[in-house]
């Protein structure tokens, strides 16, 4: 299938691990036609229609003789193999849906409800074990058993409560209490040293600035200069001694998502293990350099939780964190060195980094359609088709496919212009 680079497939996944498609989320024919019409008006939405699911639907529609128009027969619509492209297949899918009768819609709905497949959450089980297919947290265990599903590049988790998600990531990692206590003790120790380092650096900076000012004004005498120079040197020696006290913070790689040790621990299915080995899409892992870890550990105004998460390859974008921390996170995000970024919804409009997967948190259920589209746009910004996905923790995806009559953003903009 030929594919234009800007026409991607980014499947939407619900909280149970199933793909979201227009023909699988409707209740009647009028609802279906409204959704199709909206998608035809806003063709950008086609990027969220999964090609594999489209193929299954088209095959079903032809098998059940649901093509009610001659121009929509396969031979008429696709005149040659060269005519088959990703965008044309998606357009074809919408046109078939648009011409279905009420009886056909009912038949289609019943068939796909009975034959729904899970995209994530049910292949990582031991052979011959019984699985309960009512899991409402499929794909949520991003630091343990579901990490392997996050492939090709970094993931963004958009939420109103980054700290809550951060704590969940640590909790689910199953780091032994003794190990966790030791790590937090070291991080706390380094933070205390960091505060002292910060004060010393400020003292050195102030003295050097004062020396330069006196020098420019001609007020500094030779003896005074020497004294101030000695004081600066003494402070620098104290700074060096303090810095040498900083302890190295290391975490066993089995607690770092998608390292070999981690995958060996959490992938229990031998069939899945072999499938991953053969797949061109490999589980993505962080590549955090020691210098970045050291820089974060030295920051006095960063919560221990976020220092611990960085070691795991997880960063945070939020207005609540120190600017110095945020700058390091931006550098790591730009170079795609982080496994996961937990971002507050305030960062939806200002995050231009490349992500292959995204999560939309439960606490964003009231997000507007426009803001949702902006949020989803964070994923799949690469110029190539990779293995992408957007995973919803609430049914917010329904808002994506429905025409929104009163856009809050447009109303606010109109008010702004009227008031000027």
Where are these regions (language model features)?
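A short acidic, often aromatic-flanked loop/helix-cap motif at beta-alpha or helix-coil junctions
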Residues: 5-8, 322-324, 398-399
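Conserved C-terminal RecA-like helicase domain
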Residues: 14-343, 355, 364-388, 392-396, ...
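The feature captures the ABC ATPase H-loop/switch
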Residues: 346-347
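Conserved helicase ATPase motor motifs in RecA-like P-loop NTPase domains
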Residues: 1-7, 157
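Long, hydrophobic alpha-helical segments
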Residues: 401-420
